[in-house]
Each structure stands twice: as structure tokens, then as C-alpha cells.
């Protein structure tokens, strides 16, 4: 009853893992250390896909192993990672369609009570987890900055993956495409 629940969004396009990855990567740092981030964008619910829990820079993440944490992996500084497979921390009855309720929420509650990650399941190496192939911003042969539209918000704004460093690099090119 003392937990604060912050619902970041319900506006992710259905099953859009890339959009989810960007929202997680761009929002988690605004929460205090110790925050438990539960990610339930899960096209594989009810299948044999794994659920993982990890620690990164004092934050905990609980998500399906479907690539939604790709950008966190790329950012580095990942601590412990476990495959959440200890049923002692799940509800007794697990449905095929509500793992958010039956697994993610109870495991998140146990994390909030201080249970160690290692108690939740089997250690796993980051290289064994699913990562999405997400195009990185680049400068084309035509000297154009090319990025990916990650999502279009409800106001029609295009949110891209073009970051400050990519834009800065592009803006420092002369007309011939060489750095100034």
C-alpha cells in the first residue's frame, strides 16, 4: 500500500517493441534510484518467452525477453540479470494472457520489499537475451542525416532516434561533407 505507481503511458502502438524501447530508455533516468520499472508490452504473452529482471545504475527492470530493453543494454552499466523462473514469486494460478497481473506485478511487489534479484530465478548473460535491430542515425552519401521515426504522438509530432551527438556531428560538416 505504500508503493507509488506511475503509469508512463498507454499510448504505445499495440505490440510496438521499438517504441517501447525508446520510451524506457528516455524516461527511466527521471525516476529515483530504487525504482522498479515493469514493462508489459508483450506480444509473446502465453508463449515460452522468458521474463527477465535486471539492475542498471540503481534501477530495476522487469520485462519480457523480447528486445524491449535493447537500448538499455546498448547504454551499458547493466548489473545482475536473471531469468524470472522461480514460481514462488508468481500468483498460484497463471493465465495465458495476463502475465502482467499473474507474474510481473507479484514479482515487482517482491522486489519492492527488498528481495534480491538472484532469488527470482536463474542468472543469465546479456549476450543470451533478445535484442532488437534498431537502425542508428547516420549521415548518408548525399550528406543527409538519416534517422528512424520511433513514433508519432497524438499531436502529430514525429519522435526520432536522432540524438544530440548525431545532430552535432551533422551540423559540423562543411558543404563537401567533411568535418569543420
Question: Which residue ranges define each predicted feature?
Answer:
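Anionic-ligand-binding alpha/beta catalytic cores of soluble enzymes and soluble regulatory domains
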Residues: 82, 92-174
Amino acid at each position: 500500500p505504500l508503493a507509488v505507481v506511475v503509469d508512463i503511458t498507454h499510448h504505445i502502438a499495440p505490440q510496438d517493441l521499438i517504441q517501447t524501447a525508446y520510451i524506457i530508455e528516455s524516461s527511466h533516468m527521471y525516476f529515483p534510484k530504487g525504482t522498479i520499472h515493469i514493462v508489459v508490452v508483450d506480444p509473446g504473452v502465453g508463449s515460452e518467452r522468458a521474463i527477465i529482471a535486471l539492475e542498471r545504475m540503481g534501477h530495476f527492470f522487469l520485462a519480457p525477453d523480447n528486445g524491449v530493453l535493447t537500448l538499455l543494454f546498448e547504454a551499458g552499466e547493466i548489473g545482475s540479470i536473471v531469468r524470472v523462473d522461480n514460481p514462488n514469486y508468481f500468483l498460484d494460478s497463471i493465465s495465458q494472457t495476463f502475465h502482467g497481473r499473474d507474474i510481473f506485478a507479484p514479482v515487482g511487489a517482491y522486489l519492492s520489499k527488498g528481495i534480491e534479484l538472484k532469488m527470482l530465478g536463474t542468472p543469465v548473460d546479456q549476450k543470451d537475451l533478445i535484442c532488437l535491430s534498431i537502425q542508428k542515425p547516420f549521415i548518408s552519401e548525399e550528406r543527409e542525416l538519416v534517422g528512424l521515426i520511433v513514433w508519432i504522438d497524438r499531436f502529430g509530432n514525429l519522435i526520432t532516434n536522432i540524438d544530440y551527438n548525431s545532430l552535432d556531428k551533422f551540423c559540423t560538416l562543411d558543404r563537401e561533407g567533411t568535418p569543420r
